[in-house]
């Protein structure tokens, strides 16, 4: 079962901020979280039932540092459509 600690961060890019005006929140999580689990997290911790949840898997970038190749961890990104009357004060910019 997923919980609030599986949410790594809220994404604040230019695209994400434009989507936020339309009521869509972009969330980065661990790869094991599913759409239904994320809906339950939003219901339990934020008291909001998402209207729609879209997800995508993102591969971690391969990076080099002083000739040694490393890899950033893989993650999952969710686009969460919230109701118009929903306000998440703790998550807004």
From Swiss-Prot:
The keyword rRNA-binding appears for this protein: yes
Record-linked InterPro entries: Nucleotide-bd_a/b_plait_sf, Ribosomal_uL23-like, Ribosomal_uL23/eL15/eS24_sf
Keywords on record: Ribonucleoprotein, Ribosomal protein, RNA-binding, rRNA-binding
Biological processes annotated in GO: translation
Cellular component annotations (GO), alphabetically ordered: ribonucleoprotein complex; ribosome
GO molecular function, one term: structural constituent of ribosome
Superkingdom: Bacteria
Family statement: Belongs to the universal ribosomal protein uL23 family.
Subunit-structure text: Part of the 50S ribosomal subunit. Contacts protein L29, and trigger factor when it is bound to the ribosome.
Function: One of the early assembly proteins it binds 23S rRNA. One of the proteins that surrounds the polypeptide exit tunnel on the outside of the ribosome. Forms the main docking site for trigger factor binding to the ribosome.
Name the record gives this protein: Large ribosomal subunit protein uL23
């Amino acid at each position: 079962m997923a919980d609030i600690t599986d949410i790594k961060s809220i994404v604040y890019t230019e695209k994400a901020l434009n989507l936020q005006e339309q009521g869509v929140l972009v969330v980065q999580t661990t790869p094991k979280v599913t759409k239904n689990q994320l809906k339950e997290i939003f219901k339990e911790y934020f008291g909001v039932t998402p209207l729609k949840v879209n997800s995508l898997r993102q591969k971690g970038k391969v990076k080099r540092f002083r000739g040694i190749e490393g890899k950033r961890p893989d993650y999952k990104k969710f686009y969460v459509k919230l109701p118009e009357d929903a306000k998440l004060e703790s998550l807004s910019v």
